């Protein structure tokens, strides 16, 4: 994989986090969202691996779409069975992710270099980190998914001064600051943002 592709994928990954800000208000939601994202990603890789050996090239994208959507539905049903209240918050975002992947497969030609495990790993870590920090700042606790809703494992009085940082607007602003720092730190090694695109 080229250095150009990895840098571009990393930047797009950071921008994409903004789409999931409403779903990362608690660590429990962020954790299940990251697991769903990985289920979607690896089901897509599995479909591509199987299609290389058992299917023709023209039918491979359709097989990948079907397996990806099936994996998303199975994961959604699994969450509904164990964590029904949390599932109500995450369901739209799980299927938005699956639909985005489906449109990507249907409307664009597949490029093997565009798939980056680094990007997927960074995306998952940042989603989990953002949800953890937001819940600590806003509610003064850390929660895990439970059948009755949320199980609090750490609790302390939240700070009213920095609570704004845990809201949707505050999180987007924080992501923008982190992205600016990320880009500024890389200026010594990369010519410019325009040159990477």
From Swiss-Prot:
**Is Mitochondrion among this UniProt entry's keywords?**
no
User: What is one cellular component GO term in this UniProt entry?
Assistant: plasma membrane
Coiled-coil features, chain-numbered ranges: none
Q: Membrane spanning segments where? A: 12-41, 78-100, 120-142, 162-184
As given in the record, the signal peptide range reads none
Q: How does it sit in the membrane?
A: Multi-pass membrane protein
Tell me what this protein is called: Uncharacterized protein TP_0149
Q: Which organism is it from?
A: Treponema pallidum (strain Nichols)
Arranged from A to Z, the UniProt key words for this protein are: Cell membrane, Membrane, Transmembrane, Transmembrane helix
